[in-house]
Amino acid sequence: PKRDSKNYHDSPLLGFRSQLDERIWWTQLSLNFISGTARGVKDLSAFRYYKLKERFPKLNDNFCDANKSYLNKYADRNPENGAKFFGSTTAFVATTDLWHLSQFINHTTMFVSMIIPLYPSYDRRLNWKEIAGRYATIIGANAIGYHWAYDKQFRF
């Protein structure tokens, strides 16, 4: 049977009021899992690149190894020569190496997931238990994504 806002179950922990509300929550969880995964990849490229290289031997060290790739934003990979191209040290730095790309994905997905619930109009506000429940599950999804990327995929 199709559920709508009139007969939808009212979750005491998360406060779902409609299928749309539940879909928004699942979207937030998914975005935060991606965010956590990107954060894990970023930290791997900075602190345990050798594990990434073991798993993916064809990785380009100049793009993926944070100890080398930060030079990609500079002309001839030399900071004294200035930016490699317009925005390579500012607005477009995410295109220069894996660390910055992962950070961009981490921040973008996190911010988008926080903005999503601001737009639908609801007939009532969430109570403190519902807010705490949603916050806990969303932060949990981010932590699971990080743990999955940083620890589980590259066992230490």
What positions do the PLM features span?
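Cationic, hydrophobic amphipathic alpha-helical membrane-interacting segments
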Residues: 3-156
